[in-house]
């Protein structure tokens, strides 16, 4: 009788709380007792009553429990519950219930969304969350009538992860689209039970795919930032008044990635710095993206054109070809420990180039731009791609080639070094030698401006 009265006091006390409230301890009552049945009207038992807790040496009864007040039990999930095999520490065996509490909605996003792979009448939206989540993108030509896109692989929605990649397909070139990313925390993902937490929705961002056959665009190219935030921000100040359509990071920007956290931090720095939620970015590999423990995982943060680290695409009537030079030393160099085979990658791109130079998209393009990190011309060291690629490229009618790697700005007009097209090499990560390239296509003209971190013009090609 006294126990039942104490239960009423407990219920009254619990009702005054607005947050999850837990009750744990020796109830001195078995699961079938009137007391436990009455308790369960207001409390949800989280421990497993089928696992006995008393007496500790050889348990035969369940009289210890962990329970949650039902009125406020929505902000968590039970991950596991067990009675610990500890027969001597007490006359009761300990109970352990592992809970996962819900994150606040305003803490769910780790990064802002950033746009990738704006080809084939589509756009990829990527972002990260602080917790495993079920995610989707809401998008449309206005913010009142929205479609929903998710990533579905082999019939299953990709979820319960933190790095998110969702493709928006069948978009209209030249049409402005609005979108926002949505992430609902997944507290529990089991075979027959899912528990969801709060939902976060980003602010609306917008983007526009290029009009098919457009003859004008502006692009910005960075290189060799080597995770130097100060240098990057100084260069961004020089382009803040430029209305650019896409951005290329031409290698050694997210260098030597040691961990997911390190990569995420600087990728966010880069994408936010160039308004990557509205402007698509292309991340190309330099030799330093290939190094360190997280180098293989780095590709998960991007959506490469054709799912390769090299490729080609059209921006209007201009063809852009991107190559991956791999490392700057031979595969048998001791520092690689026989874990590299860039010879295969370079040979693979020979086949790619032969096909690329023969397709109508390349042949009929009004202008053709080549990008790769390590220069074939003007490089202090040996370019391991030269023997494979030079003869193919010297026959191709490229209008400009943009390179990096040497950490020293240089411009080599056509023919100066035996090059069959003009070559521009970007500067390095030190503020005094850093550069940013502005690529401008207007009707029949293709121009490149190179600025330093002070805003001084180093080159204005015609």
PLM segments and residue spans:
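Active-site regions of metal-assisted phosphoester/phosphodiester hydrolases
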Residues: 1-106, 187-190, 212, 353
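Active-site environment of divalent metal-dependent phosphoester hydrolases
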Residues: 27-34, 53-61, 227-233, 255-259, ...
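His/acidic metal-ligating clusters that form di-metal
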Residues: 2-40, 133-135, 242-246, 273-280, ...
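Acidic, histidine-bearing metal-coordination/catalytic regions of metal-dependent phosphoesterases
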Residues: 72, 90-93, 98-221, 240-242, ...
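Conserved beta-sheet core of the metallophosphoesterase superfamily
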Residues: 36-68, 164, 380-444
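Extended active-site neighborhood of metal-dependent phosphoesterases/phosphodiesterases
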Residues: 182-206, 261-358, 388-397, 410-429, ...
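Conserved, compact domain cores that house catalytic/ligand-binding motifs in diverse enzymes
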Residues: 215-293
């Amino acid at each position: 009788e006294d126990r039942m009265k104490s239960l009423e006091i407990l219920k009254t006390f619990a009702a005054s709380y607005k947050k999850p409230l837990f009750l744990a301890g020796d109830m001195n009552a078995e699961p079938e007792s009137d007391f436990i049945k009455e308790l369960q009207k207001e409390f949800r038992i989280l421990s497993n009553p089928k696992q006995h807790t008393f007496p500790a040496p050889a348990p035969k009864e369940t009289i210890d429990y962990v329970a949650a007040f039902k009125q406020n039990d929505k902000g968590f999930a039970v991950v596991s519950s067990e009675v610990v095999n500890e027969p001597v520490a007490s006359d009761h065996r300990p109970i352990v219930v592992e809970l996962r509490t819900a994150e606040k909605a305003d803490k769910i996003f780790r990064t802002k969304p950033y746009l990738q792979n704006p080809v084939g009448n589509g756009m990829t939206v990527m972002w990260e969350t602080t917790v495993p989540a079920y995610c989707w993108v809401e998008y449309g030509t206005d913010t009142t009538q929205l479609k929903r896109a998710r990533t579905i692989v082999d019939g299953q929605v990709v979820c319960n992860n933190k790095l998110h990649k969702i493709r928006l397909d069948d978009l209209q070139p030249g049409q402005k689209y609005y979108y926002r990313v949505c992430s609902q925390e997944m507290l529990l993902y089991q075979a027959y039970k899912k528990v969801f937490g709060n939902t976060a929705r980003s602010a609306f961002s917008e983007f526009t795919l290029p009009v098919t056959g457009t003859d004008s665009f502006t692009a910005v190219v960075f290189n060799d930032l080597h995770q130097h935030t100060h240098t990057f921000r100084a260069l961004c100040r020089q382009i803040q008044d430029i209305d650019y359509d896409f951005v290329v990071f031409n290698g050694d920007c997210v260098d030597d990635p040691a961990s997911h956290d390190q990569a995420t931090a600087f990728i966010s720095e880069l994408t936010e710095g160039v308004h990557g939620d509205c402007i698509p970015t292309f991340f190309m590999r330099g030799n330093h993206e290939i190094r360190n423990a997280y180098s293989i995982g780095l590709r998960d943060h991007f959506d490469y054109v054709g799912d390769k680290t090299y490729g080609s695409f059209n921006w209007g009537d201009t063809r852009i070809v991107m190559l991956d030079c791999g490392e700057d030393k031979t595969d048998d160099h001791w520092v690689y420990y026989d874990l590299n085979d860039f010879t295969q990658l370079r040979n693979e791109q020979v086949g790619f180039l032969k096909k690329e130079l023969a397709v109508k998209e390349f042949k009929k393009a009004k202008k053709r731009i080549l990008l790769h990190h390590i220069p074939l011309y003007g490089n202090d060291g040996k370019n391991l791609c030269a023997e494979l690629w030079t003869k193919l490229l010297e026959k191709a009618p490229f209008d400009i080639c943009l390179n990096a790697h040497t950490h020293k700005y240089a411009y080599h007009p056509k023919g100066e070094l035996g090059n069959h097209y003009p070559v521009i090499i970007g500067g390095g990560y030190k503020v005094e030698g850093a550069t940013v390239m502005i690529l401008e296509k207007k009707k029949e003209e293709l121009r490149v401006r190179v600025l330093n971190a002070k805003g001084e013009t180093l080159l204005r090609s015609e």
